[in-house]
Each structure stands twice: as C-alpha cells, then as structure tokens.
Amino acid sequence: MPRTARIKDNNGIYHIMIRSISEVQLFKCNADRDKFLELLAKYQKLYLFKIYGFCLLGSHAHFIIASNGADISKFMKSINQSYAFYYNKKYNRHGHLFQDRFKSKLVPSYSYLLTLSAYIHNNAKDIPNYSKRIEKYAYSSLKTYLNVSNNPLGLVDVSYILNLFDDNFNETKHNYFELLKHYLENKKGTLSDNLDFKNEHTK
C-alpha cells in the first residue's frame, strides 16, 4: 500500500521525531549524541532551517524546526543518512537504522507551539537521574532557553518562542520555566496524549 503524502509547508514550523528500529539504540553513548548534533549543525548551515527546540533520548529524538524555505524531506534525509553511515561504520553493522524516514507534524498555532516546546523539554524527566532536574540534561535545548550563552554550536534560536512571553529577558526565562513545571503537573489531556503522526509519512 503506498504511503500517504507528507503534509509540507516550506515556511512552516514542524514537530519532527526520529526513531531507531526496535532492537537498536539510536544513541549508545554521548559521543553519538555529539556526532548527531554536529551533523545537525552542518546541514543547518547548508539548508538554513531554524531549530526552536530539541531533545535527544536513547531510541529517539524530538525537534521543533522551522523550515525557513527549505524542504524538510531533503535536509532530514541528509541528516539521517549521514548519521546512519557514521553509526553503522562505528558499530560494524549493516542495514536500516531508522524506523521509517522520520515523523513530522505542522505546528498550527502559538499555543500548540508552547505546549509542544514544554512537551519536548520535559522528555528528559524519563532519563535516570533527571526526573527532578530536566534543566541539567546536556542533550536538550532547555539549557539554552535558560542560559542563552549555552549554545556552543549555535543550533538553537530561542528568541522566537521566548518573544511570546515578556520583553524582560530574566522574567521571560522565569515564565518559560514556570510553563514547563505547569505542563509537568497538568499533563492530562495535553499534547502528549495526541502525538500520533498518523498521516505524516513520506511517499
């Protein structure tokens, strides 16, 4: 059966998720996560897309990406293929690494964007030793939101989301962290219950 066409807008903002096949960890160690972020930075410079948030976990990763005129299928294919080549060579394996190509969903509103950002940054709570200190997790963009200087690869544009809050930067950081805590305490019926991506496959 043919795949449903991916819904795309070259000026849209997307929730993108990548996941490894079931028996494989996508990131076995922090060196793998570092390599993936290097590749993300490489292709960001080439395609000029913007990243508003990310969280790299064990078997999967989430991103908020503004395509900024680029075709998400093209740059995600480049990123995933490059990482799979690195991974297979490093671990002496062959075959597919990713489950499907990637999942994507257009962000329809500012309120959805804020909830999505909170959802993605709260993913770190499921990592051992980070349930009560998600802001300490190194492979999430939350650290950049709370300390803009903490953005060594220049990957993340925090201004788009933070500008939805207060003009005062310190107050904005406080308000954003309060949003995360509110999301964590009131998850029922929120975005985390509705991330199905069921119609978002490439052909």
Task: Tell what function each PLM region has.
Residues L56-H60:
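Short Gly/Ser/Thr- and Asp/Glu-enriched loop/turn motifs at secondary-structure junctions
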